[in-house]
A protein has these predicted regions:
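Outer-membrane beta-barrel initiation region
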Residues: 1-67, 71, 75, 79, ...
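Residues that define the transmembrane beta-barrel architecture of outer-membrane proteins
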Residues: 20-22, 38-42, 69-73, 100-104, ...
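Transmembrane beta-barrel strands of outer-membrane/channel proteins
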Residues: 28, 57-61, 89-93, 120-124, ...
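Residue-level signature of outer-membrane beta-barrel architecture
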Residues: 48-50, 79, 110, 124, ...
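Repeated loop/turn-to-beta-strand initiation elements of outer-membrane beta-barrel proteins
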Residues: 51-57, 83-87, 114-118, 143-148, ...
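Extracellular loop and loop/strand-boundary signature of outer-membrane beta-barrel proteins
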Residues: 60-63, 92-94, 105, 120-122, ...
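Detector for outer-membrane/organellar transmembrane beta-barrel domains
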Residues: 100-162
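Outer-membrane beta-barrel "beta-signal"
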Residues: 176-182, 212-226
Length: 226
C-alpha cells in the first residue's frame, strides 16, 4: 500500500525535485462482519522526505470486542533505487494477542508491470526468528470517482512461535476486493469483501482452539488521505 500511487509520486517528484513533503493515508478504516463478532480494522501509513529519501511509518491491526487482537507498526527509511522502485530498511513491532515481537526489516516497494503496487519485506527477530511479507494491490478506475481495489497479502515465518499461535512456513493468505467512491480524492467511503485463510501449522493452532481456518467477511469503511 502506497500513500499515493507510485505514478502520482513520480509526477509529484517531476514537479518539485528538491522540496521535502509528506503525506498521511488511512487506506483502510473499516468494520468487518461475518455473521459472528464484528471487528474494527485499520491500515495506514505516513511518509515525509524528498525525492530520494523518505521516512515511512506503517501500521495495521484488528480490534475485536474492544481488544487489540493483532497489530504491527513499522518505521522504515526509504531510498529510491530506480524510477519505480525503492529500498526500505528499518524496524517492525508486533503486539496484541501474545507477547510483543521486534524485528529488523529490509524490503522493496514499487510498481510492477501493469501498475501493480508491490511491497515485499524480509524480517529478522530475536531467538533466530525470521519472517517475510508480500503484498500486492491494484487500483482499477471505473469512472472518475469509482475505483475497484483488489489486494492480496501473504505472511511467512521461518520457525514456529507458539506464544503467538504462528506456525513455520506460510502462515496466512489475505485477499480483498473493495469498491470506493471518491467524493473527493482525499475522502472515499467504500464497501467490499475480505477473505482470510490460515495455513499449515498456524491453521492447526486455530483448530486446536475450535476456531476456523478461513473466514469471509463483508467490509465497509472510509479511505482518508491528507
Amino acid at each position: 500500500m502506497l500513500a499515493m500511487s507510485n505514478a502520482d509520486m513520480v509526477q509529484t517528484m517531476q514537479m518539485n525535485d528538491a522540496a521535502s513533503t509528506g503525506s498521511l493515508l488511512l487506506d483502510q478504516f473499516e468494520w468487518r462482519h461475518d455473521g459472528g463478532d464484528d471487528a474494527a480494522v485499520w491500515e495506514g501509513e505516513a511518509w515525509y522526505g524528498d525525492d530520494y529519501d523518505k521516512l515511512w511509518l506503517r501500521t495495521e491491526g484488528e480490534r475485536l470486542q474492544g481488544i487489540t487482537e493483532d497489530a504491527r507498526v513499522e518505521l522504515l527509511w526509504d531510498r529510491i533505487v530506480s524510477r519505480w522502485w525503492s529500498l526500505q530498511t528499518g524496524t517492525r513491532e508486533d503486539f496484541g494477542d501474545g507477547p510483543p515481537r521486534s524485528w529488523a526489516a529490509l524490503g522493496v516497494q514499487g510498481l510492477a508491470p501493469y501498475w501493480f503496487e508491490v511491497e515485499a519485506t524480509a524480517y529478522a527477530g530475536d531467538a533466530g526468528r525470521t519472517a517475510a511479507r508480500v503484498k500486492i494491490e491494484y487500483d482499477l478506475r471505473l469512472t472518475q470517482r469509482l475505483v475497484v481495489q483488489p489486494e492480496a497479502e501473504a505472511n511467512l515465518y521461518g520457525k514456529a512461535d507458539p506464544a503467538r499461535q504462528l506456525g513455520a512456513g506460510l502462515a496466512d493468505l489475505d485477499m480483498g476486493l473493495r469498491l470506493r467512491y471518491e467524493i473527493r480524492r482525499e475522502f472515499a467511503p467504500y464497501f467490499g469483501v475480505a477473505w482470510r485463510r490460515l495455513c499449515g501449522e498456524t491453521a492447526a493452532y486455530a483448530r486446536a482452539q475450535n476456531l476456523g481456518a478461513s473466514e469471509l467477511q463483508w467490509v465497509a469503511g472510509l479511505r482518508l488521505w491528507f
